[in-house]
Amino acid sequence: MPVLEVLHPLVRHKVGLLRAADISTKKFREITAEIARLLAYEATADFPLEQVTVECWSGPTAVDQIKGKKVTIVPILRAGLGMMDGVLDMIPNAKISVVGLSRNHDTLQPEHYFENLVGSLEERTALIIDPMLATAGSMIATVDLLKRKGCRDIRALVLVAAPEGVKALSAAHPEVRCWTAAIDSHLNEVGYIIPGLGDAGDKIFGTKG
């Protein structure tokens, strides 16, 4: 299944902390970054390794290093930025690509307004990051864009997904794997995930209340 729910106890505990209605902006940011690190750990488990020799304190020693993987992290503005530092902690040499999409609150469809992508996407693994996979419209649009630019290895990391979004992403891009910290119950009538986290962008940036 292309959408993989990470059921590790630490992940489940931290998602529970995020759901608290009275969580502070500071705490929401911190836990979002922590979960992003854990999702990045899961999403890179199949990266190939090669042995190299390094000079250890005891002499030359063979060690494992990731082999030839060029990675670009692709936050979907604006909420995806809240996950970026957590992923960078795990992959500090990754390049950053940015995609700006906003959701039309009448149609629930994504509207593209910005992009700044690194070069040589055909040689890179792209990790799209966005806290919420609701209708999956923004995620599908971002995958479409990366494919048009030549990227062939595309993965996604989200905090919370709705079954509707899981189904839509799987139908549109069955080869794209997505790691999520939780698959929730459903979308409400205005396209919010239930129980969800509320507006993750507002909680990360401290806007609206």
From Swiss-Prot:
Provide the reaction this enzyme catalyses. Answer: UMP + diphosphate = 5-phospho-alpha-D-ribose 1-diphosphate + uracil
Domain of life, per lineage: Bacteria
Q: What is its EC number?
A: 2.4.2.9
- Which terms are listed as keywords in the entry? Allosteric enzyme, Glycosyltransferase, GTP-binding, Magnesium, Nucleotide-binding, Transferase
Key word Nucleotide-binding present in the record? yes
Please share the entry's free-text remark on the cofactor.
Binds 1 Mg(2+) ion per subunit. The magnesium is bound as Mg-PRPP.
Which protein are we looking at? Uracil phosphoribosyltransferase
Upper lineage? Bacteria, Pseudomonadati, Pseudomonadota, Betaproteobacteria, Burkholderiales
- What gene codes for this chain? upp
